């Protein structure tokens, strides 16, 4: 599977980069961006992660199938783009796809765990802020739709998980934030709030205060 091969390479090179950084004498803050493809269609996984889930207990979409002719104009156009009108997707097909997606998410979790393990080994775990984000969600069969490109919650909302020194543990923020906020946030974290601005104006707003409970 090319996705697995690719992500294994990303994890390997990220691990090596961290080991190289630990051997370096440069004391400046670092930014390591490890861009994994998982979870992403095609929904293919390995037996190891598939077996973490009971297939019969995989949940089905909360919003049932909506006939293409009854969908909004954009959803109709997208359905025809992916040729959804040419295929009948059974309940078992849906359950299998969702099962694989969950398994792929667990594989991604394991890859992140590898990087966290290296941070611990090089003594940087306690002073490193770790952020998990994604560029899009996944419809997962909701409304009868799949993949991204949909103006609905499942496709538009992405995770933003943050852990590190000074970050509140176990807090779930209800305010809307954006991926645009990442750069000013990283800037504040790296400069202890000194406000060094790489460009002016800088899109987005720093979330550093929010992460700390301000």
Which residues make up each language-model segment?
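Zinc-coordinating Cys/His ligand positions in small cysteine/histidine-rich zinc-finger domains
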Residues: 179, 183
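Active-site-proximal cap/lid insertion segments
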Residues: 1-12, 16-28, 33-176, 189-201
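Short, intrinsically disordered, charge-balanced linker/junction segments flanking boundaries
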Residues: 204-214
């Amino acid at each position: 599977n090319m996705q697995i091969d690719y992500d294994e390479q990303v994890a390997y090179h990220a691990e090596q980069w961290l080991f190289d950084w630990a051997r370096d004498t440069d004391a400046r803050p670092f930014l390591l961006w490890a861009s994994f493809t998982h979870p992403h269609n095609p929904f293919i996984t390995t037996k190891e992660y598939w077996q973490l889930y009971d297939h019969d207990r995989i949940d089905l979409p909360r919003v049932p199938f909506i006939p293409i002719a009854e969908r909004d104009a954009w959803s109709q156009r997208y359905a025809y783009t992916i040729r959804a009108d040419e295929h009948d997707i059974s309940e078992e097909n849906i359950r299998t796809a969702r099962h694989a997606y969950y398994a792929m998410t667990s594989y991604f979790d394991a890859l992140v765990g590898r990087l966290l393990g290296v941070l611990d080994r090089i003594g940087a775990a306690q002073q490193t802020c770790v952020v998990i984000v994604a560029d899009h969600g996944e419809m997962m069969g909701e409304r009868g739709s799949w993949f991204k490109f949909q103006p609905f919650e499942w496709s538009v909302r992405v995770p933003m998980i943050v852990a590190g020194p000074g970050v509140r543990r176990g807090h779930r923020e209800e305010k809307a934030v954006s991926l645009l906020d990442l750069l000013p946030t990283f800037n504040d974290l790296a400069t202890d709030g000194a406000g060094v601005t790489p460009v002016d104006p800088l899109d987005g707003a720093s979330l550093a205060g929010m992460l700390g409970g301000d």
